Structures are given as C-alpha cells and as structure tokens.
Amino acid sequence: MNNYRRYMQGHLKEVAREEKELEQKAGLAREKAGEIARQLARRFGVTKVCLFGSLATDDFDQFSDIDLAVAGLPEREYLKAYGLAEEIARPFAVDLVLLENAVETLKERVQKEGIVLYDRQGEENSPLKTPDIGNK
C-alpha cells in the first residue's frame, strides 16, 4: 500500500505541475492575442477583433492555437495582416478570420463565445490599452 500512496502522490504532483504550465501557456497566448489586436488596429485600422475558440472558452490545451475574428480588414491587406499575426503569435499557431466573409455559423459562434479584444466603438477596448482577457 505504501508504494501505491507514493505513486499517487507523485502522480498528483505531476498533474499539478502540468496544469500550472498549461495555465502559463494560456496566459502567454492571451497576451499575444491582445498584442495582435492592438497591432491590427494600429497598422490596418480594423474595426473589431474578437478572440474565440479554446482560448476564449477555457478549453485551452497543449495543441490550442489563437483564433481571432476580425472586422474591417480589407481583403487586399489580409496576407500582410496574417503575416504580422503569425509573427506575433509565435510559438502559437494563429487563425485569422475575416468576419465579413465568414459563414453564418462561425459568426454566431464568435457572437456567442467571443471576447472582444478591440472595438473601435468601445472606449474600454481601445488599441492603446491592454484588453482584460486574463481570467474571463
């Protein structure tokens, strides 16, 4: 029984360590999402940036990426904006979705679960401030 108890204690410590690492990784991903939103607003004049997906719904895991929905980004600027987002997001992968071109089900998903990182209309999410997306 003693070996089992030691095994369980070690296992629980390992699980706690992994959870802490994952929380730190999610925090870094949120910081990067906020920086991407600020840079898209400054450089491309987007009107809105929303975080959605696992990072917005607290389902973040070791394979998660940063999912961002963007409004007001001209299509001709998409590749430049995506390149910038990709650069900032490293080591995370990033998905950048143009809301104007998104299918209705994706728009509904963003509306339902999304966290607004930047909204030209909203004072609290101005591009000069860090959006509060830490602990949703």
Model-predicted segments: where are they?
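Catalytic core of pol beta-like nucleotidyltransferases
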Residues: 1-45, 57-62, 73-136
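Short gly/ser-rich loop at a beta-strand->alpha-helix junction or flexible surface loop bordering the NTP-binding
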Residues: 47-55
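Short hydrophobic/aromatic beta-strand micro-patches
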Residues: 69-71
